[in-house]
């Protein structure tokens, strides 16, 4: 039996994140326009920007999937035909859709554009997938609450021509496949229209009815608990299991995350998938450096979601609230020549610091800052100015644009 070659599907919140995803090996990217997407926080793409983004992606052999996955009311539907026609004209490779009314409009106003069913739809069984296939969908993004065995059951009952996509990395909602109303109730921001204020991440206390003004923290440990704040998902060490279940597209969450996040996570999963395909086996594990990469971004503690059964206690609920930030971008490479590296500073670093240079598809390069100089050629003991250029000795050949990072644990 042929082994599935899974697609690495990366987020692209703006043009810079699009370039990062493509450079670091994404097979496809997903992005939003200025309307009808579930992420209002990223810059997203205007109609003209979308056309340019699609052209750039296609020049590099990368597909573009456009989000159209809000749950619109009747008034919003009136604006949809123009949006769909513009998306079709831009040449997007698929529309990601939640609502059946939007699907109907897509078949009418963008009939040549493939339809992918969003995880928001909550597809958890093959009958739903077959019905959506009959309505014209070519791919489903599975409900996030499924185990690997349930994914395999879903895949086996789906039409063979239909593809199965699954989130494998990133933030998770404590709601059914992302359908949540907390934001609507508490901040009047519509979570199913791209405006979620993430109240599940807030710190909550209890108040007893007769003791007004006396607040009691909801505690699990001495540091308390954020009762609805889930860990982040990470499945980089379980690629054989995902492929065996029939998943043909590995989706990375994070359109609102940074360019650095996009680059690192895309690079890690691209490298891990390629390593597996080069020597497939049931006991495959990615190289240590590939796993380490996903710990060098801002992240919450990791878990495997529902893939291996319903989460229990510390497997899912997160007790600290904030992000883990043990690495930061120190600089971006500008040019490398004659044993000297020129960089553009992003965070302060010092003479003698050990820095890592992120490499595409291979282990990072560790260097020590020696002979640090400012743009005037003067020797300095640190690089304090954001965006300013500095040079230091470096024998390695470093491509322009490479991320150079520093462990904050060593400060």
State each model region's role.
Residues 1-23, 28-31, 35, 60-70, ...:
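Surface-exposed amphipathic alpha-helical tracts and adjacent flexible/coil segments at the periphery
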Residues 2, 14-17, 35-126:
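Active-site beta->alpha loop and helix N-cap motifs at the rims of alpha/beta catalytic domains
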